Design a protein with these regions (language model features):
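Conserved N-terminal subdomain of the carbohydrate kinase-like
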Residues: 1-105, 109-117
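Short, surface-exposed, charge-dense and proline/glycine-enriched linear segments
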Residues: 63-72, 101-110, 133-137, 168-178, ...
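Short pre-catalytic strand/loop immediately N-terminal to key active-site residues, enriched for Gly-Thr
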Residues: 12-13, 199-204
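Conserved phosphate/ATP/ADP-binding segment of small-molecule kinases
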Residues: 117-198
Length: 204
């Protein structure tokens, strides 16, 4: 059985993050090993949420797994609670990613033109380091703009989105997938780019 490590928060309410990743990955007959980055009372769109940062647990977990010769077919990252966690995740990659381990990065930090509550304007710069290590990076449009220094706007045409994807690819990932792309009224899809082949793929 293949094994995937999912590094992201546990939101006690809100249908997201590890509470979604664990059952979905498990339903695909893949073992999902979880690495909680924080425990939140709700996801960050609820006002007044409370959070317990688990930064000090990430590397001890990684070191213990390594001592047990744990192998991972993939490592997926989602919500990282602080700049420190972006550094810890990169060290997690160094400890546990083998030559065939897929690194899948969702730079979950923003939506609707704004950073999530609790993140300062410098946070995208830290997240770039994680994205640079990815084999596959899957930001939404807001996150892609923040990562590439592109001014956010409400409407985008295909040439502009492709330009953003090219800028994302320059950060280092082998494949970039833009999520939440508006293809029409009430219709969202994805736009992907593989820089090695200079090839785009649309679904929506």
């Amino acid at each position: 059985m293949k094994r995937v490590a999912s590094i992201q928060d546990i939101s006690c309410l809100g249908r997201c993050s590890l509470t979604v990743a664990l059952p979905v990955i498990s339903a695909m007959a893949v073992e999902c090993a979880i690495v909680p980055t924080a425990v939140l009372s709700t996801h960050t769109m609820f006002p007044g949420f409370i959070s317990r940062d688990l930064s000090d647990q990430l590397l001890p977990i990684a070191r213990h797994w390594k001592s047990q010769n744990v192998t991972l077919d993939a490592i997926c990252t989602g919500y990282l609670a602080s700049p420190l966690q972006t550094e810890e995740v990169c060290r997690f990659f160094d400890l546990l990613a083998g030559p065939d381990t897929l690194l899948f990065v969702d730079p979950a930090m923003a939506d609707g033109g704004r950073l999530y509550a609790g993140f300062g304007p410098d946070f995208p710069g830290y997240m770039r380091r994680v994205v640079a290590r990815a084999h596959v990076a899957v930001p939404n449009v807001t996150e892609a703009c923040l990562l590439t220094g592109t001014p956010y706007r409400e409407d985008y045409d295909l040439p502009r989105l492709r330009d953003i994807l090219r800028k994302l690819a320059e950060l280092g990932p082998r494949h970039v997938v833009l999520t939440g792309v508006p293809y029409g009224p009430d219709k969202l899809g994805v736009l992907a780019y593989t820089p090695a082949e200079d090839r785009f793929f649309e679904y929506g």
